[in-house]
Amino acid sequence: MRRSLAPSQLAKRKPEGRSCDDEDWQPGLVTPRKRKSSSETQIQECFLSPFRKPLSQLTNQPPCLDSSQHEAFIRSILSKPFKVPIPNYQGPLGSRALGLKRAGVRRALHDPLEKDALVLYEPPPLSAHDQLKLDKEKLPVHVVVDPILSKVLRPHQREGVKFLWECVTSRRIPGSHGCIMADEMGLGKTLQCITLMWTLLRQSPECKPEIDKAVVVSPSSLVKNWYNEVGKWLGGRIQPLAIDGGSKDEIDQKLEGFMNQRGARVSSPILIISYETFRLHVGVLQKGSVGLVICDEGHRLKNSENQTYQALDSLNTSRRVLISGTPIQNDLLEYFSLVHFVNSGILGTAHEFKKHFELPILKGRDAAASEADRQLGEERLRELTSIVNRCLIRRTSDILSKYLPVKIEQVVCCRLTPLQTELYKRFLRQAKPAEELLEGKMSVSSLSSITSLKKLCNHPALIYDKCVEEEDGFVGALDLFPPGYSSKALEPQLSGKMLVLDYILAVTRSRSSDKVVLVSNYTQTLDLFEKLCRARRYLYVRLDGTMSIKKRAKVVERFNSPSSPDFVFMLSSKAGGCGLNLIGANRLVMFDPDWNPANDEQAMARVWRDGQKKTCYIYRLLSAGTIEEKIFQRQSHKKALSSCVVDEEQDVERHFSLGELKELFILDEASLSDTHDRLHCRRCVNSRQIRPPPDGSDCTSDLAGWNHCTDKWGLRDEVLQAAWDAASTAITFVFHQRSHEEQRGLR
């Protein structure tokens, strides 16, 4: 072969008449041979077959590319951003990067030996012989809570997280994956559940995530709160999907995108949705499986026949956590529904539960029960608690005494005014509601009578229109009102409770910088509060069912600000009793009682919670000798039942028989406190306390363990003392107790 055609020489030549390297190679186009220069000897030689076009540029000329075409081509690339090939994908690209498969020995996600590490699972110890026999790719690893969370968890919260994890991973009850978080308000149930979700989404003993998706179902007013709490504690490590509005198609599209996520591609692994929205769109959520469902305010599921319960029960998941600070609200059968939802079958069927547990326990709790009934009731109670305690964790608010200032609760009995008394007696004579209350069953008319009497106890202005229209029970009652009376202007002196409230607000405003929360079950009563505040020139804000969720958050944030001039926060217990944090105030007035103690407890827990720095004062106003005291007594009966089953307190006294609770429509004008009369208190003589409460008593104790006062001298609240001075005839009796003894120098 001629040397000039050798590959080593061919690559160095400059072909003639060529404009670019895209033309075909022709062996005849060669140039005369030149002697190598020293620089040419350093050029890398390459081999090029004569039967294909060269792979490298054969000339020193630049490639023939049109610059405008090049720029246009680059722009076309940049104008088409990468799109994730997942149907209906809405989230970000995520923070997970591609990488190599983990090599070496399997290890826990976080160091179990680190200081204050919270270890949820520890592999069983293995001998050296066992370690050689087992496959290293199948060795279980420690499950350790992320240090970003474990360092902020309090001791009771660490215990709670471990309990929850053991329940949902079927380590406490084999074959069952549910539990009830029944801690009282203020103990951090939300943080514990966020820690559980984050741990399950990131790790397991098998060195992979336990779940890939979780759903949080809550009241609509708490959807935004859950979203904020996830962001607060996880700091952007995860992007939850909160459904708080939108059209049906938009919500369906978001839910389909959530359900279509798989494995490591889950960019939004937490869905936060309201009960109402969940029920309406459950068809989309049933199309796939979910690793975990958390139901906040889970006592909504007390009735297994309602649509919300059935919709949630149809969700394809075995891991279920139910959050409820008050799992028993009305009866044990509702309690059964909650336990059955999280762990189906552990208490049998509803019929079996009622026969074996509910009837014997309730019969044994009745004040008129025989000794045999009591023994059987206690035996069945022990059996029930032994079963349920394996999947229910309950801590009371006395734990908070280590972290929060003192709380003083006061039940203030107020005397009816002469106008209220005459209206009350006339209604009982005319409407005769007691005759319609047969066998403890309430008819529609008796329920209406209860509402009328409750409103009358708040203020006669609330039943003035009924008097004008001469409705049943108020015929001729208009003559009892003062001459020239108008419901447009509020007259506090016509209501015993409103008069006491007027004094409490005035004394608080003049003697301190404290703020006050006013709570009522009726928006009409909130209207009266507004009139009172305008008359006294108090700045106020109001939250009821008409306010949007977004506006609620802004109103609460503004009120809690130390620079806010607002003095009063008016709250409808029906609309906003759950989840609100009103630590800007340290005094709360519960103006009227609810049949359900859980509603009142929720509302009263708004000020005594994390972040509160001042001593808290809770006032529960009751009209003495009226239906309000009967409602309060019914609450005590329910709370005693709850204490027996959930708190396991065996010394809760049996004060009220079911027969006594039927005496709703009796007015006792002479009684200072019908509730105290029924206690048969041994520490009081002629309604005056002569011995203090037992040692260790606090706000969670039975009323028999509270202080009982018929004058101001035993009170610990200077504001109530001054109000009692001003309204000497309006206040008849006060129960009061504190949450704990203040530990000076330790805070």
Curated annotation (Swiss-Prot):
Domain spans labelled Helicase ATP-binding: 170-345
Mutation effect (K515R): Loss of acetylation
Residue sites binding ATP per the record: D183, E184, M185, G186, L187, G188, K189, T190
Reactions this protein catalyses: ATP + H2O = ADP + phosphate + H(+)
Modified sites of kind Phosphoserine: S38, S572
Region (Required for chromatin remodeling, strand pairing activities and coupling of ATPase activity) residue spans: 2-9
Stretches assigned to the Helicase C-terminal domain: 500-653
CDD domains registered for this protein in UniProt: DEXHc_RAD54A, SF2_C_SNF
Superkingdom classification of source: Eukaryota
One GO cellular component term noted in the UniProt record for this chain: nucleus
Impact when changing V444E: In a non-Hodgkin lymphoma sample
Modified residue annotations for N6-acetyllysine: K515
PTM: Acetylated. Acetylation promotes interaction with BRD9, and subsequently with RAD54, which is essential for homologous recombination (HR). Phosphorylated. Phosphorylation at Ser-572 by NEK1 specifically in G2 phase allows efficient removal of RAD51 filaments from DNA.
UniProt keyword terms in alphabetical order: Acetylation, ATP-binding, DNA damage, DNA repair, DNA-binding, Helicase, Hydrolase, Metal-binding, Nucleotide-binding, Nucleus, Phosphoprotein, Zinc
Subunit structure of this chain's protein: Homohexamer. Interacts (via N-terminus) with RAD51. Interacts with NAP1L1. Interacts with BRD9; this interaction orchestrates RAD51-RAD54 complex formation.
Name of the protein in its database record: DNA repair and recombination protein RAD54-like
